[in-house]
């Protein structure tokens, strides 16, 4: 079996890559400006890149693609929040609590989730209120609006600041997990395993009926089912798509594609072609390396970059 790929980069389209990079290095000081394959880039200390392609017009963020947002671990998310409050170039995004229009700017300021879910349904909120459950006010996740209308998460508390995840929507999260395991040999992310004995024949399950809070939308969000895999130390986290319309290709959107690193591109091409995976682009030169572009289960564009 070929070893699982590593996470190489997230590729964004931007009207001003230099300004975008300056924003991220200011607010996530562990990062640094760099370049890769002739493209401006942001480097995270865990050997992860965010690459930028300059575009003439603001890149679209709708209709919804499989790529929802990306995020960082931070050492103290509440301290980060207070820092960002004082910075005029940061737009903090409210998390709605499901309690008569209430909102907070960090999840630890509202009722904690339960059962491994990062939110509560309205009946669970009523129960938490009746039992006088209190916010933890420690750590938590929060969001800001980044350059080009990027949705950027920061979450704590963790040992070090680093780029740590890309959050997706999937048509069928359990099926997506099986797809990534089968075709990309991806390890399952701890705590997000699919139900036992799940197969491609049984992986399609109904979206949970109840929306949960806190959420970026006032009406809440669907968090069930959820699944995830991990490449290196970057998690691919999945919820089912929130709307009724199928997810579209991300190419040309703000979040254009995601790249994984492999040691032997030819071996991966042979494996994936033999398994019937759809190729979006045949092998091509990328800087001093080579790459190929494939399509994931919900139309996400995945670039495999040869890194020897």
Segments predicted by a language model, with ranges:
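Vicinal oxygen chelate
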Residues: 1, 82-168, 190-230, 237-241, ...
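Helix N-cap motif at beta-to-alpha junctions
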Residues: 15-17, 74-79, 172-173, 262-266
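Post-signal peptide N-terminal segment of secreted/secretory-pathway proteins
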Residues: 56-75, 79-82
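Short, solvent-exposed beta-strand edge segments and adjacent coil->beta transition regions
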Residues: 5-9, 65-69, 161-165, 253-257
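Conserved acetyl-CoA-binding loop of GNAT-fold acetyltransferases
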Residues: 26-33, 88-91, 182-188, 277-278
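Mature N-terminal segment immediately following signal peptide/propeptide cleavage
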Residues: 2-37
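Extracytoplasmic/secreted envelope proteins and their assembly/folding machinery
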Residues: 7, 17, 21-25, 77, ...
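Solenoidal tandem-repeat scaffolds enriched in leucines and small polar residues
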Residues: 172-196
């Amino acid at each position: 079996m070929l070893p699982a790929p590593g996470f190489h980069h997230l590729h964004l389209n931007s009207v001003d890559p230099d300004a975008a990079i300056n924003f991220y290095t200011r607010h996530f000081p562990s990062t640094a400006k760099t370049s890769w394959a002739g493209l401006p880039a942001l480097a995270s200390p865990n050997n992860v890149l965010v690459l930028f392609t300059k575009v003439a017009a603001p890149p679209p963020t709708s209709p919804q693609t499989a790529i929802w947002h990306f995020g960082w671990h931070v050492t103290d998310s509440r301290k980060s929040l207070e820092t960002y409050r004082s910075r005029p170039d940061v737009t903090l995004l409210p998390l709605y609590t499901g309690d008569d229009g209430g909102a907070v700017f960090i999840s630890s300021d509202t009722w904690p989730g339960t059962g491994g879910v990062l939110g509560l349904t309205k009946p669970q909120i009523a129960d938490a209120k009746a039992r006088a459950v209190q916010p933890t006010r420690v750590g938590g996740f929060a969001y800001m609006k980044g350059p080009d209308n990027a949705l950027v998460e920061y979450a704590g508390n963790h040992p070090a600041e680093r780029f740590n995840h890309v959050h997706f929507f999937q048509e069928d999260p359990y099926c997506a997990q099986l797809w990534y395991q089968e075709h990309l040999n991806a390890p399952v992310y701890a705590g997000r395993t699919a139900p036992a004995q799940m197969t491609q024949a049984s992986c399609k399950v109904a979206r949970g009926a109840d929306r949960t809070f806190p959420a970026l939308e006032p009406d809440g969000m669907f968090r069930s089912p959820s699944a995830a895999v991990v490449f290196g130390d970057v998690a691919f986290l999945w919820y089912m798509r929130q709307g009724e319309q199928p997810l579209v290709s991300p190419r040309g959107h703000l979040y254009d594609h995601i790249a994984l690193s492999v040691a032997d591109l030819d071996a991966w091409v042979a494996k994936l072609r033999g398994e019937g995976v759809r190729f979006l682009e045949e092998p091509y030169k990328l800087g001093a390396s080579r790459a190929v572009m494939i399509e994931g289960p919900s139309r996400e564009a995945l670039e495999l970059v040869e890194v020897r």
